[in-house]
């Protein structure tokens, strides 16, 4: 499904009941061997169907990160059902679009390695914003630019709140063998909490009031030859997300545009962490990642 209402629209045109239950029953009723349900929505309702599909021997490929970042017991149950039924629940594109991050972590774990630390820039939107901010382009304008370039959500507060990054970090931590909930992640945000209240229109009216403070801080940063990066970190089982200042010798310093980067420190890669870097957002690379998951099932 390419959006939460896509199947419903088809059913309505055919004069059929368009409820989730009908969609579920029809897909299961097809009883097609080696079938795959692909979810490219951001719908919690669609994600709630995964359990039934897996129990009926239907593999699930999800760009939708809601299920994998939901309550740990739900995540664990989906993985367990998939294993018991001999089908796949794959969600590589939940983190880093088409970058091979989750598969790499799985390969390390399955080969006997242990993930000691994860440090990453996982928001293409926020990286774009902090790469664009300058003396000529104030903070509020960079947010609008990210929206115009379709990097951000229609409501950019979703990106600025760090919620999307928290979900991604939770997914990576779980795949690395850590039991983590979204509520366990420490947040160090750069926009005051009251900016996330009220209407979107109110937000756009108020956000220019932050420009002067950001410019003053940016000037200090420039003199120190540092860059801002919104970093997700997992170490010793503790997780956090927040804005950091990184110097020229840091691997995150030169990260361009809306790219993502992840450093994996493991028992094997302890002195020199494994680094994965590249496009972390965009329809093309995300579609390629979804297709790769589908093909990995087709080739089983």
Model-predicted segments: where are they?
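Single conserved hydrophobic/aromatic residue that forms the stacking wall/gate
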Residues: 1-7, 11
């Amino acid at each position: 499904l390419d959006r939460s209402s896509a199947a419903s629209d088809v059913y309505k045109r055919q004069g059929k009941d368009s409820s989730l239950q009908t969609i579920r029953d029809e897909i299961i009723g097809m009883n097609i061997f080696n079938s795959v349900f692909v979810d490219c929505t951001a719908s919690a309702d669609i994600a709630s169907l995964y359990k039934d599909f897996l129990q009926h021997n239907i593999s699930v490929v999800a760009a939708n990160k809601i299920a994998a970042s939901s309550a740990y017991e739900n995540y664990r149950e989906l993985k367990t059902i998939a294993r018991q039924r001999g089908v796949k629940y794959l969600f590589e594109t939940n983190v880093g679009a088409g970058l091979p991050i989750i598969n790499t972590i799985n390969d390390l774990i399955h080969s006997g390695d242990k993930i000691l630390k994860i440090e990453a820039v996982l928001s293409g939107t926020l990286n774009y914003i902090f790469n664009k901010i300058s003396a000529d382009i104030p903070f509020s304008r960079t947010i609008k630019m990210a929206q115009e370039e379709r990097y951000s959500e229609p409501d950019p507060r979703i990106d600025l709140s760090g919620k999307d990054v928290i979900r991604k970090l939770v997914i990576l931590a779980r795949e690395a063998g850590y039991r983590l909930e979204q509520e366990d992640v420490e947040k160090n945000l750069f926009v005051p909490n009251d900016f996330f209240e009220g209407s979107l229109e109110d937000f756009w009216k108020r956000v220019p009031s932050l420009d002067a403070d950001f410019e003053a801080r940016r000037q200090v940063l420039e003199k120190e030859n540092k860059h801002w990066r919104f970093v997700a970190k997992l170490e010793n089982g503790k997780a956090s997300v927040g804005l950091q200042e990184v110097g020229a010798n840091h691997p995150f310093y030169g990260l361009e545009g809306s790219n993502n980067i992840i450093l994996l420190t493991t028992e094997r890669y302890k002195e020199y962490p494994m680094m994965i870097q590249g496009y972390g957002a965009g329809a093309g690379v995300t579609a390629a990642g979804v297709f790769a998951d589908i093909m990995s099932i087709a080739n089983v």
